[in-house]
């Protein structure tokens, strides 16, 4: 029998959420490289932050500077990268935050594994469904060019598959419409499921 037990603190998630005036959730942005995940998540965070909500954005590149700096890009390492991010996100949600996470996360199994760690309604999958052709045209980091040349192996969308969500809570193609309207759609959804109070958004406008 393990000697490691969970210590229940006197302040819980509900207490922290009440203090912050919001219902904590994890918004998981998934899609191809260049789909616009980080841009969309960043714009949503800015809108929420400016309205006084407590947020944090976990970005695929940023976590590899510290939390996951010891990991490469093998299948095993990518799985471990997402496992760690999922655990950190869970702690942040427990702290009462609205957490935004922008990762390719190419397999349904990976995403479903993270979803399973959260109570019903706290994991919101946002499929950034921008087509491969558009992502490849954008290619902000030059990664698609390298992948086509064979310089990058197991590159999602080129030499490694991306499994689109079957039942994402939201689907947004960033090649259609403008960023402001896409953020508005996200905010409308969060308002509808009572994650945020719309009156605070009105007051900050």
UniProtKB/Swiss-Prot annotation:
Its EC number is 2.7.1.25. ATP binds at residues 31-38. Coiled coil: none annotated. GO terms for biological process: hydrogen sulfide biosynthetic process; sulfate assimilation. Keywords: ATP-binding, Kinase, Nucleotide-binding, Phosphoprotein, Transferase. Pfam families: APS_kinase. The keyword Nucleotide-binding applies. The active site is at residue 105. GO terms for molecular function: adenylylsulfate kinase activity; ATP binding. It catalyses: adenosine 5'-phosphosulfate + ATP = 3'-phosphoadenylyl sulfate + ADP + H(+). It comes from the Bacteria. Pathway: Sulfur metabolism; hydrogen sulfide biosynthesis; sulfite from sulfate: step 2/3. Gene3D superfamilies: P-loop containing nucleotide triphosphate hydrolases. HAMAP family: Adenylyl_sulf_kinase. Belongs to the APS kinase family. This is Adenylyl-sulfate kinase. It comes from Shewanella sp. (strain MR-7).
């Amino acid at each position: 029998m393990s000697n490691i037990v969970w210590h229940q603190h006197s302040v819980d998630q509900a207490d922290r959420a009440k203090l912050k005036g919001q219902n904590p959730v994890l918004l998981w942005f998934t899609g191809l490289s260049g789909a616009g995940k980080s841009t969309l998540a960043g714009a949503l965070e800015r809108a929420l932050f400016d309205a006084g909500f407590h947020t944090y954005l976990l970005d695929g590149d940023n976590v590899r500077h510290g939390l996951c700096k010891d990991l490469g890009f093998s299948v095993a390492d990518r799985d471990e990268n997402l496992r760690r991010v999922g655990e950190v996100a869970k702690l942040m949600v427990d702290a009462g935050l609205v957490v935004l996470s922008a990762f390719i996360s190419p397999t349904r199994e990976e995403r479903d594994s993270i979803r399973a760690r959260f109570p019903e309604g706290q994991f919101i999958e946002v499929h950034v469904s921008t087509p491969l052709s558009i992502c490849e045209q954008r290619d902000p980091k030059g990664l698609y060019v390298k992948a086509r040349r064979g310089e990058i192996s197991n590159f999602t969308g080129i030499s490694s598959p991306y499994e689109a969500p079957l039942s994402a809570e939201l689907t947004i193609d960033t090649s259609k419409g403008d960023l402001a309207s896409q953020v508005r759609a996200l905010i409308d959804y969060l308002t509808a499921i009572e994650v945020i109070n719309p009156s605070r958004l009105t007051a900050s406008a």
